[in-house]
Amino acid sequence: MGYKEEGKWWVSPADYLPEVTKDYNFPEHIEILDTTLRDGEQEPGIIFTKEDKVAIAKRLDAAGVHRIEAGCPMTSEEDAAAIKEICSLGLKAKIYCFVRGVLSDMDVAKACGVDGVIIEVPGSEQMLQGGMRWGMEKAIKAASEATKYAHELGLMVTFFPSDASRSDMDFLSTLLNGVLDAGGHFDSVALVDTFGAFSPEGAAYMVKELLRRVGKPVEAHFHEDFGLSVPTTIAALKAGAFCAHVTVNGIGERAGSCPLEPLVMSLQCLYGQDTGIKYDELLGLSKEVAARSGKPVPPTKAIVGSRLFGWETGLPTGYWQKSRDINPLIMMPYHFSMTGQPAPHIYIGKKSGAANVALVNERLGLAPIEDKDKVKALLHKVKELSIQVKRDLTDEEYIKLYHEV
């Protein structure tokens, strides 16, 4: 596997140079935990019904997601019922739910039939004291009792110290080791960047420190407040974290969560890390979540946008016209079919040239225009109308102008 895979991707050869990759410490297998049904739904205005959650869980499983965080059963009776039904489906994915550091929450989770729990306790001094009015001793007591009880119930346990990214490293490691020393148990710890405050370098540092000081597998839960959730998650994985938390389309509070689609495609194409996700399922999954969340996908959104493959400007359209039968990857970093996208669409508008006319005519079944003067006349009309309406033209608008010349 390298920077160029026939029919799949063609990225920079620099991405795979030994001097670039020499310090990578990716795990042997990267796990993807999707939290669309919990953290994604926390975006104001997004409400998933039981039917929505079950349908999305099925699509996540079909896409190969390894773990599904199906929600928080204490939120409502419907959420608990949705989690129970998802657990009854026999999906390949492991099903987790989100709980507080309260013993009764573990009983509710167990009754839902989940494989594991994600137990939240504040992980920074400011959140403990300012948000909970707790001291370190109380936090350790609550977390150790909750994690121990969850383990005794046969549940896998991910400890989720919120706001960990803004914690002092000594404070965080004291909390985590204190939980273990007090008899608590967790199978992994999430490095939680609740407010999207990590740089990639900061995340990598804290992953390494957690592995060194606590010795438990690390998961990466990052947000998009500075637009860096994907590179920061990759930095955490490169530093030894084994699991990435994501949402479909990046939905979530404030600027959202780490989006599934560009993360897994970047890992595959730019870093040679196959997560096992079925990339050709990404577009359908994205559309399903967009429809059920009521939040449309921007047309230029990475990987799943509707206008990623195609051109209006004349120069790249000309390049495509000449190269499409040689190798489509000359004009794109990964093949459109890899993610379930349709073939490139040629638009026509203010910035278009003769190649656009030729390819749009071909697509619409219109006769080629051999007379160059007629092509120029048609383009003049196209540009005038495009400027007037401030967009590229519809097929109907173009056909009308075509027949005029």
Segments predicted by a language model, with ranges:
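Catalytic alpha/beta core domains of metabolic enzymes, predominantly
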Residues: F195-D325
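Alpha/beta enzyme core
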Residues: Y3-E6, E43-R67, E85-L89, L103-K216, ...
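N-terminal capping/small domains of soluble enzymes
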Residues: M1-L103, H345-I348, S352, A358, ...
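Active-site beta-loop-alpha junctions enriched in small/polar residues
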Residues: R38, P73-T75, F98-V102, P122-S124, ...
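Hydrophobic alpha-helical scaffolding
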Residues: I46, C72-P73, I95, V99, ...
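Short hydrophobic alpha-helical runs that function as membrane-insertion/retention elements
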Residues: K94, I118, C243-V246
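A mid-to-C-terminal "edge-of-domain" accessory segment
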Residues: G2-T36, G272-V405
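Conserved active-site and cofactor/substrate-binding residues in soluble primary-metabolism enzymes
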Residues: F48-E51, A55, E77-A81, S104, ...
